[in-house]
């Protein structure tokens, strides 16, 4: 589990100014935190963290010397400026189930010999205790053939009794369909007029 260093943010300084100075703003909230705790982290530290972790990942958040077991709840990415503006964290309590998402990662798609893969779902929503959190669900699609479908209920996360799925178990994660090359028929003289 990765650790991210942060510091309490003074609300006297605007977020825009902090971003210009190389910081990313955020909030830490949770049952044992009154209201929420405004924080700031260096852009460099956030960029490093997001190389391996994202929304739904569990991280250790160190704020002014105090360490929190936290879940990344939201990442506010500014596409126009090509930067992360804000990250929100939820402080975890070992006995409290939290709502999270797990990213779906398709493995071995280059080994599918016939057909085209259609990914219908990018993440799975669920509730679990901190000890049972999952940030990525890997799906091996190498054996898929035309007509094959993998649903949420087919994945390991759905079979874990400690996880309460919020995504429909019947939802299609990925399917393999035939390639249809449509060749336009030549126009006849009558149709051209």
Regions found by a protein language model. Name each.
Residues 1-193:
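Acidic, negatively charged sequence tracts
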């Amino acid at each position: 589990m990765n650790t991210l260093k942060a510091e309490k943010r003074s609300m006297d300084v605007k977020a825009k100014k902090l971003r210009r100075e190389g910081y990313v703003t955020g909030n830490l909230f949770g049952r044992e935190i009154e209201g929420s705790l405004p924080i700031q982290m260096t852009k460099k530290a956030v960029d490093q963290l997001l190389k391996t972790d994202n929304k739904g990942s569990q991280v250790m958040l160190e704020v002014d010397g105090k360490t929190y077991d936290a879940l990344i709840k939201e990442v506010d990415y500014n596409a126009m400026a090509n930067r992360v503006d804000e990250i929100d964290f939820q402080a975890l309590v070992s006995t409290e189930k939290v709502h999270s998402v797990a990213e779906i990662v398709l493995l071995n798609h280059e080994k599918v010999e016939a057909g085209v893969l259609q990914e219908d779902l990018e993440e799975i929503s669920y509730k679990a205790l901190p000890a049972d959190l999952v940030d990525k669900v890997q799906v091996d699609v190498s054996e898929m053939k035309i007509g094959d479908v993998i649903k949420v209920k087919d994945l390991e996360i759905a079979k874990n009794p400690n996880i309460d799925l919020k995504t429909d178990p019947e939802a299609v994660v990925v399917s393999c369909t035939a390639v249809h090359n449509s060749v336009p028929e030549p126009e006849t003289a009558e149709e051209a007029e």
